[in-house]
A protein has these predicted regions:
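NAD(P)-dependent Rossmann-like dehydrogenase/reductase catalytic/cofactor-binding core
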Residues: 207-211, 236-246, 250-340
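NAD(P)+-binding Rossmann beta1-loop-alpha1 motif at the extreme N-terminus of oxidoreductases
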Residues: 1-56, 63-67
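Internal alpha-helical scaffold of NAD(P)-dependent oxidoreductase catalytic cores
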Residues: 92, 103, 128-139, 157-205, ...
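Rossmann-like NAD(P)(H) cofactor-binding subdomain of soluble oxidoreductases
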Residues: 64-71, 76-157, 173
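A short helix-to-beta-strand connector/capping loop
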Residues: 54-67, 136-138, 180-182, 307
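General beta-strand structural signal in soluble alpha/beta enzymes
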Residues: 112, 138-144, 184-188, 246-247, ...
Length: 340
């Protein structure tokens, strides 16, 4: 896997496009697999993805290929790849994996970039791979951390974590993704890396909600800090290491997503706090805010495991039970006093 590697990135959204751009800059042979024929043609002709990264020039070495996932056009590409980067939304991942069965080469490495928990089964992507593509569990990795797609695509310095249970594979993947502006660390704590990336989206909606209501920086800092605490509690209950949540895929991603205006989940919270309805917000966004569905999954997991997650529970009440945003934040502040 050293030197030039044949890589396919599945998903032509902002993150998939940014990673294809990054990997092409790193000297690899990169195919970007997407469904829209016109979008693929535009990328190949103009080296730009106008729907998701308008105005950002893409590396000319990217080859965009349109077609159905697992269909003949993409199957031809997948037959020769060493790494497949999965950049599709978490809630669509299981169906995607099923369509890839029998298409992906048996020695291919899967690198997941989705940040979420499946609502129907309450599992992360690693578990989905174990169930749908069991032969690839030992060659599975997850890339997560504070990384807005636009900044990666415009070569801004970025550091992330590659979670991989195989230390040697994790070390090789660090090299594959390395560029002068993109640095990867590796971790064997796959559950921690996946859960940190997923749950921070829930907390980001809460932080945006607080900001949209005009509650100020003190309130945001409190939400972020207490949100990190409950993220760690659930993570440990699910087998993750507490220390992982103090790293890039935990605290780092949480800080960025709760404060950066490029965060889709923060934007959902801001708009809710400003009085918009969730339905109106969702219909106006061309990109997925994973935190809305993840809130439901995390809340149900916390209830199942008996883990105290008041920020998540409050956001569930706002998003799914009609709890007024201002009263929701005030209810958090009015909880019984206790030790930290």
């Amino acid at each position: 896997m050293s030197g030039k590697t044949s890589i396919a990135v599945l998903g032509g959204g902002s993150w998939g496009t940014a990673l294809a751009h990054l990997l092409a800059h790193a000297g690899h042979s990169v195919a970007l697999l997407l469904r829209d024929t016109a979008q693929a043609a535009h990328i190949n002709a103009h080296h730009e993805n106008p729907r998701y990264l308008r105005g950002v020039p893409l590396h000319p070495g990217i080859r965009a290929v349109a077609g159905d996932t697992g269909g003949p056009e993409q199957a031809e590409v997948l037959a020769g790849v060493s790494i497949l980067v999965l950049s599709v939304p978490c809630q669509a991942m299981r169906g995607t994996l099923r369509r890839l069965a029998g298409v992906v080469p048996p020695d291919c490495v899967l690198v997941n970039t989705a940040k979420g928990i499946e609502v129907s089964e309450l599992v992360t992507v690693e578990r989905m791979v174990r169930e749908e593509l069991p032969g690839f569990v030992d060659r599975y990795a997850v890339l997560s951390g504070p990384s807005f797609a636009l900044e990666v695509a415009t070569c801004k310095p970025t550091a992330v974590v590659l979670g991989c249970r195989d230390e040697r594979l994790g070390a090789r993947l660090r090299e594959v993704f390395a560029t002068p502006w993109f640095r990867s660390y590796s971790s064997t704590d796959v559950p921690g890396v996946e859960l940190g990336g997923a749950i921070k989206n829930v907390i980001a909606i809460a932080a945006g909600l607080s900001d949209g209501l005009g509650f100020g920086l003190n309130a945001r800092a409190a939400l972020v800090t207490r949100g990190l605490a409950e993220t760690s509690r659930l993570g440990v209950a699910l087998g993750a290491r507490a220390s992982t949540f103090m790293g890039l895929s935990g605290l780092g991603d949480l800080m960025l997503t709760c404060s950066g205006d490029l965060s889709r989940n923060r934007q959902v919270g801001l708009r809710l706090g400003s009085g918009e309805s969730l339905e109106g917000i969702a219909s106006s966004m061309c990109m997925v805010a994973e935190g809305v569905k993840t809130t439901q999954a995390v809340h149900r997991l916390a209830q199942r495991l008996g883990v105290d997650m008041p920020v998540t529970g409050t956001m569930y009440s706002v998003l799914y039970e009609g709890f007024a945003p201002r009263e929701a934040v005030q209810a958090l502040m009015g909880r019984q006093l206790k030790e930290e």
